[in-house]
Amino acid sequence: MKYLITFCMCIITFTAFGQIKNIDMKKEKPKNLTECIQMLDKNLKTEDKDYIKTLTEDEFFMESHFTIGMGIRNEWIRSGNPELVTFFLDQGVKHPDDMSAMILTSYYRHLLGKEIDFEGQISAHKKELEQ
């Protein structure tokens, strides 16, 4: 129960006071992970990128899930973008939340100059599904 309350408080805090603003994702529809990263890089403001760099990967994911992540799910995944959805389905990723999580994780790692390790993300996802 203590963890549930902590989790809920984090969600409320990040949603209410988060620094990363949603960006306009309606203009272009990426077809794969590389294009997603390029479009996020192009559309995020420099101050947002600088802020993201101050966060841990988990902090970025928690803060962006209901902002940028929601935009990714609504505009790139759910609103008629068969190429991107097919890209993830071919990897065994079926849920929009999981798709946006991999895009966000990959973007964060790209921004920090880390290895994206998409295959590792897919492998971890498959292990989670097996449990």
What role is predicted for each listed range?
Residues 48-51, 55-131:
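Compact alpha-helical subdomains of small soluble proteins
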Residues 1-22:
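Bacterial Sec-dependent N-terminal signal peptides
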Residues 20-62:
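N-terminal secretory signal peptides
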Residues 7, 36-40, 70-75:
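Short, functional N-terminal and low-complexity linear motifs
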